[in-house]
C-alpha cells in the first residue's frame, strides 16, 4: 500500500500539490489551519484564496506570467483550469470571480476520493513520511520555529525587504560602467555615477516620494524593519546620508572623467547568467509607480526594465538555494519538499508552478520513482532553477520574468521577437517534457457564463 503524502497548507500551492499527488494515484492528507486558526490576511476558509488581487497576471504568452500559465495548462494544472473557468473581463489579464473560483477549487480538492482534507493547525514537523510544505508567506509561528530548527538559524526569513531588480540588457551602457571599489578583484558591479545636480534632483524626489501603506498585521511586527531601513528613510535623514551609505562614491573612478563621481548607485549581479541586476542598498517601501518614476532618474536607468520592484512586507520564505534541490526536495531531508511563496517565488502563478512540481515529485517518490526536474528553457523550470541555484547571500523572492531564461544564441536584438522566441522554445520544451513523462491535460471544466 502506498503511504499518504502530507501536504501542509491549503493555499494555491498546497491545493495544486495535493491535486497532482491524487491525480497520480497517491493518497494525500491536506492540512489547512483555517478556520481552526484564522490568518490575519485571509477572509474565508476556502482553499486557494486569493489574498491580494484577483488577477493571475497577463494572459499573452509573449509575457512571462502568460507563458507560465500556458505551460501549466499543458502540464494539467487544476488551479489554472479553475481560474480559466471563472475568468472575468480584465483586458489582457486572467482575473477571476474570487467567490466562485475558491468555492469550486475547494469542492474539487475536498471531494477527490484520494484527498483527506483536515482542518487543523500543524505545529511540528512530521516525524516521518513524505511531506510537502506549502504554508506560504504567513506561516504560523509554531511551524515557522519548526522549519527554523530543521533548516538552521538564518535560513528562514520573516520579512521581505528587497531592492528592485532590473534587466541588464535595458541599462544604458554609455552611462554606466563596470568596476569594483578601488578596482579590487574583478569588475563585479555596474556603477551609475551622479553629478551634484543629478544627485540633488534624485535626493529631492526620493525624500518626497509616496510610500505604500503597511497592512495592519505588518504594523504590529515593524521591528523586523529596524535592521533594514528603506532607502527613502535614509534620504529623509539628510542630504548627505545617502552619500555615506548606499550611494558612496569612494573608490569608483568614472572612466569618462577619470574622477570619483559626486555619488554613485551600484548594481550587483543577481543571477548566474548576469542578466538580472540588483540596486544595492535600495530596499524600499515606495509605491510601485513612485519607484519607477524616481529610480529611472538614476543615470543609465532611464529606460530600465524593472523585473521586480522593491518591497518591504511580511513574508516567510526559505533561503532556498542553500536548502532545496531543483526537484524542490530538501538536500538534507529528501522526503521533505517545499513549494509556493515559501520557496522564494513571487506571484500566484509561480506558486501554482511550485505546487505542481512538489506534488508531482512527492507522488513519484511515494511510488519509488525518480523525481522530475523541469527544463530550464521553460518559465516554470527557470523559476525553480533560480530558487535552487541562486546566490544564498543575496537571495530574494522573484516573480516570473524572461531574464531568468537561458539566452537564445545568436542573440535576437528586437525585444518582441526575442520574447516570441523564448515562448516558442519554452512551449516546445514543455510539450516534450509532458510527452516524455506521460503528463496529461487538466480536467475539462465548464466555463462560467
Swiss-Prot record:
Q: What is its main location?
A: cytoplasm
Residues recorded as binding FAD, renumbered to this chain, are: 9-14
Q: What does this protein do?
A: Catalyzes the folate-dependent formation of 5-methyl-uridine at position 54 (M-5-U54) in all tRNAs.
Record localization: Cytoplasm
UniProt entry keywords in alphabetical sequence: Cytoplasm, FAD, Flavoprotein, Methyltransferase, NAD, NADP, Transferase, tRNA processing
Reactions catalysed: uridine(54) in tRNA + (6R)-5,10-methylene-5,6,7,8-tetrahydrofolate + NADH + H(+) = 5-methyluridine(54) in tRNA + (6S)-5,6,7,8-tetrahydrofolate + NAD(+); uridine(54) in tRNA + (6R)-5,10-methylene-5,6,7,8-tetrahydrofolate + NADPH + H(+) = 5-methyluridine(54) in tRNA + (6S)-5,6,7,8-tetrahydrofolate + NADP(+)
The family database entries (InterPro entries) matched by this protein are listed as: FAD/NAD-bd_sf, MnmG-rel, MnmG_N, TrmFO
What EC number(s) does this enzyme carry?
A: 2.1.1.74
Kindly report, in one word, the top-level EC class recorded for this enzyme: transferase
Q: Which residues form a coiled coil?
A: none
The name this protein carries in UniProt is Methylenetetrahydrofolate--tRNA-(uracil-5-)-methyltransferase TrmFO
- Which cofactor is essential here? FAD
Record HAMAP family: TrmFO
**GO terms for CC?**
cytosol
Which Gene Ontology terms cover its molecular function? Answer: flavin adenine dinucleotide binding; tRNA (uracil(54)-C5)-methyltransferase activity, 5,10-methylenetetrahydrofolate-dependent
* Listed Pfam families: GIDA
Q: Which family does it belong to?
A: Belongs to the MnmG family. TrmFO subfamily.
**An annotated GO BP:** tRNA methylation
Amino acid at each position: 500500500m502506498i503511504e499518504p503524502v502530507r501536504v501542509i497548507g491549503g493555499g494555491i500551492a498546497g491545493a495544486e500539490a495535493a491535486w497532482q499527488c491524487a491525480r497520480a494515484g497517491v493518497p494525500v492528507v491536506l492540512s489547512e489551519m483555517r478556520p481552526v486558526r484564522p490568518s490575519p490576511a485571509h477572509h474565508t476558509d476556502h482553499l486557494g484564496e486569493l489574498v491580494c488581487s484577483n488577477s493571475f497576471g497577463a494572459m499573452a504568452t509573449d509575457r512571462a506570467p502568460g507563458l507560465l500559465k500556458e505551460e501549466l495548462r499543458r502540464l494539467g494544472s487544476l488551479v489554472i483550469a479553475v481560474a480559466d473557468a471563472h475568468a472575468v473581463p480584465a483586458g489582457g489579464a486572467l482575473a477571476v470571480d474570487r467567490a466562485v473560483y475558491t468555492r469550486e477549487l475547494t469542492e474539487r480538492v475536498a471531494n477527490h476520493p484520494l484527498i483527506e482534507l483536515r482542518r487543523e493547525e500543524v505545529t511540528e514537523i512530521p516525524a516521518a513520511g513524505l511531506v510537502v510544505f506549502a504554508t506560504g508567506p504567513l506561516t504560523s509561528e509554531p511551524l515557522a520555529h519548526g522549519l527554523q530548527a530543521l533548516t538552521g538559524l538564518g535560513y528562514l526569513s520573516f520579512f521581505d525587504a528587497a531592492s528592485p531588480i532590473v534587466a541588464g540588457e535595458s541599462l544604458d551602457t554609455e552611462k554606466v560602467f563596470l568596476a569594483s571599489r578601488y578596482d579590487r578583484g574583478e569588475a563585479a558591479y555596474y556603477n551609475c555615477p551622479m553629478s551634484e545636480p543629478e544627485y540633488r534632483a534624485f535626493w529631492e524626489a526620493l525624500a518626497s516620494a509616496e510610500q505604500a501603506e503597511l497592512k495592519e498585521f505588518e504594523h504590529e511586527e515593524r521591528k523586523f524593519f529596524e535592521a533594514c531601513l528603506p532607502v527613502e528613510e535614509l534620504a529623509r535623514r539628510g542630504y548627505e546620508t545617502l552619500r555615506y551609505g548606499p550611494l558612496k562614491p569612494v573608490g569608483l573612478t568614472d572612466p569618462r572623467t577619470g574622477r570619483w563621481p559626486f555619488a554613485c548607485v551600484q548594481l550587483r549581479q543577481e543571477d548566474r547568467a548576469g542578466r538580472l541586476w540588483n540596486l544595492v542598498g535600495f530596499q524600499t517601501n515606495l509605491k510601485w509607480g513612485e519607484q519607477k518614476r524616481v529610480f529611472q532618474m538614476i543615470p543609465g536607468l532611464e529606460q530600465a526594465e524593472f523585473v521586480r520592484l522593491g518591497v518591504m512586507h511580511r513574508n516567510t520564505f526559505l533561503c532556498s538555494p542553500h536548502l532545496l534541490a531543483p526537484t524542490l526536495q530538501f538536500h538534507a531531508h529528501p522526503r521533505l519538499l517545499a513549494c509556493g511563496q515559501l520557496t522564494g517565488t513571487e506571484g500566484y502563478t509561480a506558486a501554482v508552478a511550485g505546487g505542481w512540481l512538489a506534488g508531482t515529485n512527492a507522488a513519484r517518490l511515494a511510488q519509488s520513482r525518480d523525481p522530475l526536474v523541469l527544463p530550464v528553457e521553460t518559465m516554470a523550470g527557470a523559476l525553480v532553477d533560480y530558487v535552487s541555484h541562486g546566490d544564498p547571500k543575496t537571495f530574494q523572492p522573484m516573480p516570473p520574468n524572461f531574464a531568468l531564461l537561458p539566452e537564445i544564441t545568436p542573440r535576437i536584438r528586437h525585444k518582441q521577437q526575442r520574447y516570441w522566441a523564448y515562448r516558442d522554445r519554452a512551449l516546445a520544451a514543455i510539450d516534450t517534457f509532458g510527452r516524455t513523462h506521460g503528463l496529461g491535460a487538466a480536467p475539462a471544466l465548464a466555463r462560467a457564463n
